[in-house]
Design a protein with these regions (language model features):
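Beta-propeller fold detector
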Residues: 23-27, 66-70, 108-113
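Beta-rich, blade/repeat-based domains predominating
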Residues: 28-44, 72-86, 92, 114-131
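Short loop/turn segments immediately following the C-termini of beta-strands
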Residues: 6, 41, 50, 60, ...
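Short loop/turn segments that connect beta-strands within beta-propeller blades
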Residues: 16-20, 59-63, 101-105
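Short coil/turn segments within WD40 beta-propeller repeats
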Residues: 8-10, 52-53, 94-95
């Protein structure tokens, strides 16, 4: 399992499903990390930082960290979901749901006019995880 911590030292952590083998995997250049989502096909972990207005990605151990998009793109992401080659997020600037094509790099607003969209989930029975 993976989680974020907005505490005095913001971080992303992971552990086994019984809480053992706890590890801090991402630190530094984080303030309000949230919206974790895993791209199962590529074993990559995506997250948003609601304070720094950016979306980042790393491998499942926090290595190979890369910036996907930042406030330069006029985003304020909160919740994230990934499905095939599309990254979806709730956006407080547009008050809607946007997406980003991970292959082409194109960005779109899909839904607008929401009040304060917090989270987003994709449902596809093929994406059900199994684990220990």
């Amino acid at each position: 399992m993976y989680w974020t911590d907005w505490g005095s030292s913001p971080k992303i952590e992971k552990a086994e499903m019984d809480g053992s083998a706890r590890q801090i995997i991402v630190t530094g250049n984080l303030v309000w990390p949230n919206g974790l989502t895993i791209h199962k096909a590529t074993n990559r972990l995506f997250w948003a930082d609601a304070k720094l207005d950016k979306i980042e990605v790393s491998d499942l151990n926090g290595r190979n960290r890369q910036l996907i998009m930042s406030s330069v793109a006029d985003i304020h992401p909160f919740g994230l979901a990934v499905y095939h080659d599309m990254l979806y997020w709730t956006d407080w600037n547009t008050r809607g749901i946007s997406n980003y094509n991970l292959s082409s790099g194109t960005k779109d607003t899909l839904v607008d006019g929401l009040q304060q969209p917090m989270d987003i989930h994709v449902f596809d029975p093929a994406l059900i995880f199994s684990g220990t």
